[in-house]
Amino acid sequence: MKVKYFAWVRERIGKPEETVEPPAGVKTVEELIIWLAARGETYAHAFETPRVIRAAIDHAHVKPDAAIAGAREIAFFPPMTGG
């Protein structure tokens, strides 16, 4: 699946997107964040406060417990503000 990173998540990881193949046990957005954070220091820094990270699966905003099975694209970004 393609994973995209936006704003400071992208800045901390150092790339805008990548293709990943998480292990079979990674079934939710929350589990994907945990798996990504374990991939190295830059990922750990980007996901150090996972409760503030927002996610979208195939362009639809989702909660951390959303299933990732069948997802083509998952995006991670910080909270947005309006104005």
Would you name each region that the model predicts?
Residues 1-82:
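Ubiquitin-like/PB1-type beta-grasp interaction modules and other compact soluble beta-rich domains
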